[in-house]
């Protein structure tokens, strides 16, 4: 931010909130490939360092400055001289430049106060996504109803671009964004319900993530005054911000919420929790189902009238914890009632007292997980292991190491499961798939290969490696902690889910 602060003062001081001229500034595109923007460990390098030379950027700016290249009609779009050059390269350079420009007013707002600077520094350290589950264990057992739903995708990115342009108060920038989307992008493939926003391909870059995150941010603004109105809930919003790598702050500093438009009685003694990961969110409350249905209707109308997004009421499910479950982060979760009887005696009379305790259960969804393994060619749709022919040309060490790494990652991720039987089945599929891949490479049968190699060591690596490591950690602790280890352990170093886990 400090690198281009001087340039911004020169451009913005003349015309307030006019971001359109920044699109044609050469230093903006130079900053696109600066170390501050390509240093993230989460985004892959696009390998444009050799192509994004200063000469190419100058040519790009020159072509953008020529108005006759930007006048496009329906009949002449294919003949446009601007499109006769490297379309993919230019589209990526321009989209990255757009992303920097539209983030400028937001970053300037957040850098204006020391308190907001602390927020920026805080969210650079990403929180583990598995820290959501200890939060569930502490809070959800005291609640009654849960709403399991998805934030609907915008029908058209023009609506998301219009919202960002309205906040930035730069109409020319909005029209240029629309022109860019029209020429370079297939609108129908940018955001689809079948794919998560975090699984964008390399061609869908930072500007689309920014627009979608801005759209989600506007939706989540409704929950800001929920937290302030509640007499019970005074917690910091518990939201994982993995997909907001380039977002400069929290939603409190994005949008003003008009809390005065809502009656105070509607939020009287509100006890509600909201958790979101990507487009999936969980809304849990202790109040009666009538209030939850009111919020369901309100959210549907909010999407319909404010975001021009139609959402069917049946897509938002409201269930009691004791009767239903919800899916989040690759787990099936529900609240189970544990009933136990305690005998009590007073004088000569004795009687039984029934004690009901709530416990959060997290279960590995074996059917969706097998479907993910089948998609990755580790087994068929019935869960029968098959060989991985793509790796058959690699060395034995490489094949075993790849399978062990996948097995460790899944075991690491699903170690918080209440029941380990499904996890052991997944390990069995991966182990047998590894053996079949090695047998395929050596042109042998599975039985002959195991007889020649010896299966015991291979089996031990798959099944006992993690257990041996953890047993060293817990060998000197009490039996109570050892029982806790045998139950479930949440690893708080997991900051994203891989493709096998992300089967929702």
UniProtKB/Swiss-Prot annotation:
It is found in: Plastid, Chloroplast. GO terms for cellular component: chloroplast. Its main location: plastid. GO terms for molecular function: RNA binding. Keywords: Chloroplast, mRNA processing, Plastid, RNA-binding, tRNA processing. Coiled coil: none annotated. It comes from the Eukaryota. InterPro entries: Domain_X (IPR024937), Maturase_MatK (IPR002866), Maturase_MatK_N (IPR024942). One of its GO terms (biological process) is mRNA processing. Belongs to the intron maturase 2 family. MatK subfamily. Usually encoded in the trnK tRNA gene intron. Probably assists in splicing its own and other chloroplast group II introns. PANTHER family: MATURASE K. This is Maturase K.
